[in-house]
Amino acid sequence: VKTSRKDLYDFIVKELKESFSDLPTEKNESNYGRFTLWGAKALLANVYLNAEVYTGDPQWNACIQECDDIINSGKYSLDINYSDPFKAHNENSLENILVIPYDEIFATGFNYHLAALHGANQKTYDLVGSPWGAGAYKGIPQFIDTYDPDDERLNATWLGGPQYASDRTPLTGSYDLMGQPLIFVNKMPNGIFTGEAEGYRWLKYEVEMGARSELNNDLVLFRLTQVHMMKAECLLRTGKADQAASIVSMVRKRAFKEHPEKAIVSGAQLQEKSCYKYGTVENYVLTSQNQVYPEKFGRFYDELGWEFAGESYRRRDMIRFGHFTKAKWLSHEPNGDYKTVFPLPQKVVDTNPNLEQNPNYQ
């Protein structure tokens, strides 16, 4: 018999709560990269944030409580710069709560730059190894277009424009732009076939000059900004929009150092529709411009995108805001509500006759 989502949710919540008394509370070198009480509370807060999806029963106040415990502990604070949590040596971040430690020699496995960058960018960073092909980690132009041009998170997350070698020599293409200037542009024909320079590249984690094929950056799982934004969302969903706006404005402040007036948002603004222009794209043209998802708390949803782009939470956000299986973007067409749940790996199902494949994946 398959365990229900609610039973699994209850089990996870119980396990996390029972672990609290056994987990360390100090933020130090010995506990770095390990679950502390604060890492466990951040995970529990995230489970509570999505409780309505998992069980049908929202747990906004419970999420706020876990967030407040972390914030009031005084163990963490926001880094001065948006990029600081993602530096090559981000073990010094004031903000990161839980990470997976990596090292270019002793703890390998983090080589995202080889997938994100164009092969020619080897000369940009004097890399030991060459990136793979033309680069694959590209931003959807419809999303990139939602950024305020003065938002520092745009250039701190995405690599666009003319590409240069470390000596400032212009780089050239290797495929459809053979011998021509390599200029990353924010456009794609349809999301299926793209030219080698089409699409900004996700480059949130610092790539050091002379980096090897493995990086020294530690992969961030939870940071204090996320805790603040989880609390803000719960306040918004419980009718405290102005309190939520105060938190969001605080988070935005470091992204608008040159334009501090743009950091301020109101509770009313957070409840507006998303500014994302949903619809499929064909031959660079948006073919269906009338979809607007989500309509409720859409601006807050946009804020999550700008702050956490590429940090592996977007799918959950899309499901929680109710449009993962409804909206169209680039070449994506809605194709079934059942896809809010992943299929079980077929190899596992074949091995264990007691397991049932999730509905519609048979």
Residue ranges and their predicted role:
Residues P170-A197, P260-N290:
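Charged, glycine/proline-rich intrinsically disordered loops and linkers
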Residues G160-R254:
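C-terminal substrate/ligand-recognition segments
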Residues Y9, K17-E18, R34-N186, K326-S331:
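An aromatic- and glycine-enriched ligand-binding surface/loop that stacks and positions planar moieties
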Residues Q163, K257, E261, W306-G310:
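Intrinsically disordered or highly flexible coil/loop and linker segments, enriched in small
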Residues V1-R5, E26-K27:
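A conserved hydrophobic secondary-structure block that centers on an alpha-helix together
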Residues L8-P24, N31-I71, L98, D151-A156, ...:
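Extended, hydrophobic/aromatic-rich amphipathic alpha-helical segments that build helical scaffolds
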Residues S73-Y82, Q243, P260-E261, E311:
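Acidic/polar loop patches that form or flank catalytic/metal-binding clefts of enzymes
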Residues R5, F11, F86-P141, E214-L221, ...:
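Long, intrinsically disordered, low-complexity segments
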